[in-house]
From Swiss-Prot:
This is NADPH dehydrogenase. The lineage of its organism: Bacteria, Bacillati, Bacillota, Bacilli, Bacillales. Its cofactor is FMN. It comes from the Bacteria. Homotetramer. It comes from Listeria welshimeri serovar 6b (strain ATCC 35897 / DSM 20650 / CCUG 15529 / CIP 8149 / NCTC 11857 / SLCC 5334 / V8).
Amino acid sequence: MSKLFSEYKLKDVTLKNRIVMSPMCMYSVENKDGIATDFHFAHYVSRAAGGTGLVILEATAVQEVGRISEFDLGLWNDEQVPALKHLVDGLHSHGAKAGIQLAHAGRKAVLPGEIVAPSAIAYDEKSAKPVELTKEAIKEVVADFKRAAYRAKEAGFDVIEIHAAHGYLIHQFLSPITNRREDNYGGPAGNRYKILSDIIKAVKEVWDGPIIVRVSATDYAHGGLQLEDYIPFAKWMKADGVELIDVSTGGLVNVAPPVFPGYQVPFADEIRRGAGIATGVLGLITRGEQAEEILCNERADLIIIGRELLRNPYFAKDAALSLGETIEGPKQYSRAWK
């Protein structure tokens, strides 16, 4: 059997294969209330029907002010749970495990009114200047991640991912470019890591399932975080109880990364080896053979697919055929692969 279609365990959760749908914002909550819609159900469940092992929902805000836009999903109140439970049931009906990415946009929120960040530094000259979070407000953010994790449990999710990448709030705390604080949340790396550590520990108080953290392994900017900074961060995450690190890059500043097939694989490889923690990797992985090579060379443990799954919900089915594997799909569509 190919490695790509072997089972993988995240704590007590067994994935049927190593293909993961990357969280990708759809900006499709037209009512602006954070509640998942029929579109979200069709969008995610179709990828489960296509054979994806783990489907991770897009960035889901833990606070209303933490949305990237007014059209984001949310888990800041109980009214948002039932629609997500319905969606999770749909994922499970096709044999996929269900994950959700809990997030706070920080200074990258594009919303009416006040936005917040670790320091009062705007994303760019076109963006609103955020208000620096007080210590009390930081503790409330941590508490809201915990509350959202509890709601995710109520909705039946199998996996929680904490979004600490792409220039959003937690990443803003981690990077010295965006964190100029002089209290115990700023300065040395251990202080800048504190909010993420506090969030992980708070989530674990209500959640006994696997926790993934998405990181940006380089800021692509002078004075920002580089790969070597993430080895100690990853070790601390492992000690805090994180099962796997989802390795991406960039997003903190308005700089386009150099992009080519598998461009983030070296980052996942180095973190995996340097910190002794499992990693998932994404970034222009578009073919089954490419994914298999990454796994067989032990450069990552899970393959996270983004845009290719937008183009092709049946990526898993097609990847299996390319690797000489047979996986079941919806019987209604079986003639498509004869």
